[in-house]
């Protein structure tokens, strides 16, 4: 990947996309992780005075992530607010009379965060910028109407392994680059722990699938896992179907 060309293309994409919305500001949910750091840095380069971050921790969130998110915003001149989502999560727990699984609570947390981002976008006349990478999108590793929701997404065609390298080029803090990727949905949660494979292994196969290359050299169990995830989760990337009754 040519980092200089990629940076220029993405900044141009962000500026053009924002201009078409007739709003003024970028809003990014900043977790202290890699993807949101890269996206918010690109937004800050595109519109230095018009980039806002919301930091949305829960009680279970790693305090290091909170500190990294704050440090990142201050380094890049991103105006930010911190809003705890714990009251929303507790209200959800209190409203249910059944056992709430981690996946249900995690999805709820992702949707609460996105609700707060969209509410903030209305407050300041802005748009929510997406932070889901190509690896996550192909695997369906995200919450529909949660972290997958956005007005536009500058990193949606970059694999996670590419983002690691691109982040170094952008001078993202090493402590953010080196930490284990996590959606921060529950205590101790990690992407690779959930998926059962590291991103390097996943991306190699995903890249081959995307380019319609032979998969013969790869482990069949891993291929099956990836192909099943792609098939079962592709609905997350589609707009709701509408039955066309007119015309």
Swiss-Prot record:
**Keywords, comma-separated and alphabetical:** ATP-binding, Ligase, Magnesium, Metal-binding, NAD, Nucleotide-binding
Q: Please name the GO terms of the biological process aspect recorded for this protein, alphabetically.
A: NAD biosynthetic process
Provide the GO MF annotations for this entry: ATP binding; glutaminase activity; metal ion binding; NAD+ synthase (glutamine-hydrolyzing) activity; NAD+ synthase activity
Residues involved in Mg(2+) binding: 35, 136
Q: What is its EC number?
A: 6.3.1.5
Q: Write out the catalysed reaction.
A: deamido-NAD(+) + NH4(+) + ATP = AMP + diphosphate + NAD(+) + H(+)
* Annotated InterPro entries: NAD/GMP_synthase (IPR022310), NAD_synthase (IPR003694), NH(3)-dep_NAD(+)_synth (IPR022926), Rossmann-like_a/b/a_fold (IPR014729)
Coiled-coil ranges per UniProt: none
In this chain, deamido-NAD(+) is annotated as bound at: 111
**Which residues are recorded as binding ATP?**
29-36, 131, 160, 182
Checking CDD domains in the record gives: NAD_synthase
List, alphabetically, the SUPFAM superfamilies matched: Adenine nucleotide alpha hydrolases-like
Q: Which Pfam families match?
A: NAD_synthase (PF02540)
Q: In which pathway does it act?
A: Cofactor biosynthesis; NAD(+) biosynthesis; NAD(+) from deamido-NAD(+) (ammonia route): step 1/1
Which Gene Ontology CC terms are recorded? cytoplasm
**Family, per entry:** Belongs to the NAD synthetase family.
The task this protein performs is described as: Catalyzes the ATP-dependent amidation of deamido-NAD to form NAD. Uses ammonia as a nitrogen source.
PANTHER family given in the database record: GLUTAMINE-DEPENDENT NAD(+) SYNTHETASE, NH 3 /GLUTAMINE-DEPENDENT NAD + SYNTHETASE
Quote the protein name from its UniProt record. NH(3)-dependent NAD(+) synthetase
Annotated organism of origin: Campylobacter hominis (strain ATCC BAA-381 / DSM 21671 / CCUG 45161 / LMG 19568 / NCTC 13146 / CH001A)
